[in-house]
Amino acid sequence: MHLAYPAVLSALLFCTGLYGVLARRNAILVLMSVELMLNAVNLNLVAFDVWLSRAAEETLHSGQALTLFTIAIAAAEIGIGLAIVLAVHRNRGTSDIDKLRDTAEGHEPDGPDTDTPATGTAAEKAEATA
């Protein structure tokens, strides 16, 4: 098998994952897209390991060992990421990245703040309540 086939498939998977990271607003879908990108890198590592071992006539399998390490790191990353998304969803009620960014910056997406009146100073407010 030629090196071009897994390399093209890896590039397509990586581009699909990159599109998902840039276009999706749901945090879980973004995590899934990151995992797709990591799997594309893993495919590329194994393909180049097989190609280089045939060219050098050695069997070091360093690409496969690195792929196993990457899979272990990706499993830990997805576990921690899903735990964070679940905690944020319980606290904020949404997993939409734009809405989370707006609430973190203190912006009210519903409209103007109703706690402060539009006119009047502190002295006028004190006289009005007395």
UniProtKB/Swiss-Prot annotation:
Pfam families the UniProt entry points to: Oxidored_q2
The keyword Transport belongs to this UniProt entry's keyword annotation: yes
Primary localisation category: membrane
Region described as Disordered: spans on this chain: 97-130
UniProt keywords, alphabetically: Cell membrane, Membrane, NAD, Quinone, Translocase, Transmembrane, Transmembrane helix, Transport
Biased composition (Low complexity): 114-123
Transmembrane segments annotated in the record for this chain: 3-23, 28-48, 68-88
Basic and acidic residues composition bias: residue spans: 97-110
GO CC annotation, single: plasma membrane
Membrane topology label: Multi-pass membrane protein
GO molecular function per UniProt: NADH:ubiquinone reductase (non-electrogenic) activity; quinone binding
E.C. designation(s): 7.1.1.-
Disulfide bond entries: none
One of the protein's GO biological processes: ATP synthesis coupled electron transport
Quaternary structure and partners: NDH-1 is composed of 14 different subunits. Subunits NuoA, H, J, K, L, M, N constitute the membrane sector of the complex.
Family statement: Belongs to the complex I subunit 4L family.
HAMAP family: NDH1_NuoK
Function: NDH-1 shuttles electrons from NADH, via FMN and iron-sulfur (Fe-S) centers, to quinones in the respiratory chain. The immediate electron acceptor for the enzyme in this species is believed to be a menaquinone. Couples the redox reaction to proton translocation (for every two electrons transferred, four hydrogen ions are translocated across the cytoplasmic membrane), and thus conserves the redox energy in a proton gradient.
PANTHER family recorded: NADH-UBIQUINONE OXIDOREDUCTASE CHAIN 4L (PTHR11434:SF16), NADH-UBIQUINONE OXIDOREDUCTASE SUBUNIT ND4L (PTHR11434)
Name of the protein this chain belongs to: NADH-quinone oxidoreductase subunit K 1
Source organism of this protein record: Streptomyces coelicolor (strain ATCC BAA-471 / A3(2) / M145)
